[in-house]
Structures are given as C-alpha cells and as structure tokens.
C-alpha cells in the first residue's frame, strides 16, 4: 500500500464503530484490484450530535466516501445535497459519495438483503416473513418488494409492524399466530435477537421451521446465530448475516471506486477477521 496526498479517503462513522469489519473488507478489495494507492478506508467513532460537523469536514477536506452505520443513517440525510430515490423510499442513507463537491446519499442495505437470497432462489411471489420493524427492516422490505416478493411484517410491538406495512403497502402479522411460520418460503430476522445479551434466544419458536424454507439472519456477530443453528438442524437453507454485510459492502465499493468489487476476496477477508 503506497499512500500519497492523492489517495482518496473513505470513512465509516458510527457510535460505536471499533467493531466494524468494513475497513478490512474494503481495503482488501482495493488491494486485490491494485488500487490501494488510490483509495484507503478508515473508521471513526462519531457522536450523533457531531454528524453535521463530519459532513462539513467531508465537504471541506474532500473526503471521497462516507459510510454511515448506527445511529447515523437517518441523521446524515439532512446535510446532503442529493439523495437517490431508493434511499428516500427506505428513509435512510448508509453511503455518501463526494462527487466533485456534491454530496450524494445512497442506500445499499437493500442489496445486502436481496443478493444473498437471489443466489439461492427467485424472489418473485415468494412468501416472506420479516421479523422486526426498525431501520434494517425497512431496507430489507424495500428490496424484497422491489423483487416481487409477498412480504408480511412481524414485530414484538404489533403497532409498529402495522404502521410499516401501511407505509410499504404490504401485510403485517401477529407473532401469537405461530402456526403460520411453517407456511413461509423465506424468513428474515432483522431484530437484535441473536446478538449479546440475547445470543441464546431466537425471535420465533424454531419447531415450526422446516426443510422447504430459507432462513436469513442479518445479525453478524456470530457465524451462526441460534436461529440459524436450529433452522439448519431442521433441514432449512440458512444464510448468515455476514452475507448482508458483504453485499451491501460490494455495492458500496462499486459506488466509491466505479469498479466491480472482488466479492470472493472481500468475503474471505470478512471470514478471517471475524
């Protein structure tokens, strides 16, 4: 890596951010393409109230790319010059490109949800159970609907699921109606159940899972969450959260560099640094 004053800086901001695997993933991609003298990807812990200051610094210092993670994906939007239509519909930005001084916001989280599923199946007309109604769920729901899936949202607070379903013009369900779980083609968990301190819990009763289903857990703190382990025992096809991180990252990589991301190199790096 030969950095110079011409090297373009990309930065991930969050609070916290030290756990982020994105710098390792992106820098491995730059190295694989021989452009690690042109781009470097760093991390910075930024408090919520300082997001505007960071965006201003991006403008003044010519920082090339800004990745926003929790809790900055909505807050950053008010400081940008332009937001693409997808990010507007999702209501969050995870990627900012400095295009000759114009700051443009994108959302690649929806690709992180859709691409891993499409490697296994077509999404059109598939019945999908989405667990959760937070920011991550919004990107997942948008992507699934864009691909023609039949989405039903379930959330511990039922009112939030109803509200989100109205906004996206899809269905909401009741977690008490557990028998329904077995009827879905795909189940996507966007909740924090599976992360510490809930790593020994599952967001739904696993006895209803079966071999005809695909179970995708976007939690990536473990290679396999309890939900995925139990789904695998029952013959379901599983997708770990690392795939969501990878594919939102490859889409982002292409926005920042204008080049096709080296997917396998980036996946291998994520698995090594986890």
Could you say what each language-model-derived stretch is?
Residues 147-168:
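NAD(P)-binding Rossmann-fold cofactor-contacting core
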Residues 42, 152, 239:
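Conserved beta-strand positions in the Rossmann-like core of class I SAM-dependent methyltransferases
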Residues 14, 105, 117, 121, ...:
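Glycine-rich adenosine-cofactor-binding loop
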């Amino acid at each position: 890596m030969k950095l110079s004053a011409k090297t373009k800086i990309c930065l991930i901001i969050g609070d916290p951010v030290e756990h982020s695997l994105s710098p390792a993933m992106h820098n491995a991609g730059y190295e694989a393409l021989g452009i690690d003298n042109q781009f470097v990807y760093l991390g910075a812990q930024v408090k919520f109230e300082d997001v505007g200051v960071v965006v201003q610094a991006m403008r003044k210092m010519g920082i090339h790319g800004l990745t926003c993670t929790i809790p900055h994906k909505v807050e950053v939007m008010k400081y940008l010059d332009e937001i693409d239509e997808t990010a507007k519909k999702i209501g969050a930005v995870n990627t900012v490109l400095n295009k000759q001084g114009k700051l443009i916001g994108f959302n690649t989280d929806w690709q992180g949800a859709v691409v891993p599923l499409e490697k296994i199946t077509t999404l059109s007309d598939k019945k999908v159970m989405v667990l959760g109604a937070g920011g991550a769920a919004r990107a997942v729901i948008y992507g699934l609907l864009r691909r023609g899936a039949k989405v039903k949202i379930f959330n511990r607070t039922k009112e939030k699921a109803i509200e989100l379903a109205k906004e996206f013009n899809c269905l909401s369900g009741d977690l008490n109606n557990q028998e329904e779980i077995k009827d879905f083609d795909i189940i996507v968990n966007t909740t924090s159940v599976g992360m510490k301190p809930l790593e020994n819990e599952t967001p739904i009763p696993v006895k209803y899972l079966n071999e005809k289903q695909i179970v995708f857990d976007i939690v990536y703190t473990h290679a396999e969450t309890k939900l995925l382990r139990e789904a695998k025992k029952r013959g379901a096809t599983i997708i770990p959260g690392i795939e969501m991180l990878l594919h939102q990252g490859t889409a982002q990589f292409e926005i920042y560099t204008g080049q096709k991301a080296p997917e396998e190199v980036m996946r291998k790096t994520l698995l090594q640094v986890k």
